[in-house]
């Protein structure tokens, strides 16, 4: 099986990189298939303070850069190609990319998930420049500033409360007249003196020249439009969007079992419903999506893939 890899990994975020590292260290012929953007969501994170052992000056790109170095040190092959189709029906799995076709004994799907966008003008252009989708990652950049949180579910309210530890004022902007978060979470939120609420309101536009400088909001009931401008002493403010995630699972739809929201269910060993196919990182059904959990998933998936190969392909 000269042209067949032992392990092929789709996705090059922390989960995919960790899987490649563990696969290569185990002397598996390992292929890391990267899309056009290496590193996943973490590359837009300025600082990574919650990854165990990270140095104070660690950034998302620097952490990913070190992971890439380790992957190369242990001999994993890296190919930049967008996988457009997969065939998991046979013992040897086939992955079809824009640049070529790849075959492997085991496949690890680590395609990740993307935060849902608010969908207003200026959002994409100012992501990482005041617009964020991760309070844990970026809260301290808004120390003693004003912050707006878009959303009204559990995550939005919990992240808003976390942000009150840093910001002087946090305003939850919710399109409905009441929160969707669990009652216990709401009770805590309403007792927090630094939390404010804009009901029946949506964000219409985010403005700024290289940094968030103002935001336009519209009341869905009255039609009233208001614009918040960054206080002169701050120069900017934060906009955190928490309206859910979109799993990047279109590639495996109809090929693997997905839950009702599009995530891949696995067991504790990262096994999917298809023999020889594993899933790791944010694409999985899981309770916490962080760099540390993604790398753990990747490590487990690679180790289990190795065991699967040794059992099924034993000479």
Swiss-Prot record:
Cofactor note: Binds 1 FAD per subunit.
UniProt keyword annotations, A-Z: Cytoplasm, Disulfide bond, FAD, Flavoprotein, NADP, Oxidoreductase, Redox-active center
Catalytic activity, reaction form: [thioredoxin]-dithiol + NADP(+) = [thioredoxin]-disulfide + NADPH + H(+)
Location relative to the cell: Cytoplasm
The protein's name: Thioredoxin reductase
Residues reported in the UniProt entry to bind FAD: 34-41, 282-291
Disulfide pairings: 134-137
Required cofactor(s): FAD
Entry-linked Pfam families: Pyr_redox_2
Enzyme type, top EC level: oxidoreductase
Taxonomic source organism: Peptoclostridium litorale (Clostridium litorale)
């Amino acid at each position: 099986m000269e042209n067949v890899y032992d392990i092929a990994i789709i996705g090059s975020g922390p989960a995919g990189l960790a899987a490649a590292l563990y696969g290569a260290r185990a002397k598996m012929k390992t292929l890391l298939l990267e899309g056009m953007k290496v590193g996943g969501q973490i590359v837009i994170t300025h600082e990574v303070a919650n990854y165990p052992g990270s140095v104070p000056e660690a950034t998302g790109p620097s952490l990913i850069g070190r992971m890439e170095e380790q992957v190369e040190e242990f001999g994993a092959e890296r190919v930049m190609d967008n996988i457009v189709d997969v065939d998991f029906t046979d013992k040897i799995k086939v992955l079809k990319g824009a640049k070529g076709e790849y075959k492997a004994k085991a496949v690890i799907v680590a395609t990740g998930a993307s935060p849902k966008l608010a969908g207003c003008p200026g959002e994409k252009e100012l992501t990482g420049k005041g617009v964020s989708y991760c309070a844990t990652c970026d809260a301290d950049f808004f120390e003693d500033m004003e912050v707006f949180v878009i959303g009204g579910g559990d995550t939005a309210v919990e992240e808003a409360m976390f942000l009150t530890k840093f910001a002087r004022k946090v305003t939850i902007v919710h399109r409905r007249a009441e929160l969707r978060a669990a009652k216990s979470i709401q009770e805590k939120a309403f007792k927090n003196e630094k939390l404010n609420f804009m009901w029946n309101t949506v964000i219409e536009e985010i403005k700024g020249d290289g940094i968030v400088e103002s935001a336009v909001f519209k009341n869905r009931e009255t039609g009233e439009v208001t614009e918040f401008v960054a206080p002169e002493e701050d120069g900017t403010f934060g906009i955190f969007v928490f309206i859910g995630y979109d799993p990047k699972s279109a590639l495996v739809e109809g090929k693997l079992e997905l839950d009702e929201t599009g995530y891949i269910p696995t067991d504790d060993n990262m096994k999917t419903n298809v023999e020889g196919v594993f899933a790791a990182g944010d694409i999985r059904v899981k309770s916490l999506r962080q760099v540390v959990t993604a790398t753990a998933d990747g490590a487990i998936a690679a180790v289990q893939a190795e065991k699967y190969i040794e059992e099924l392909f034993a000479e």
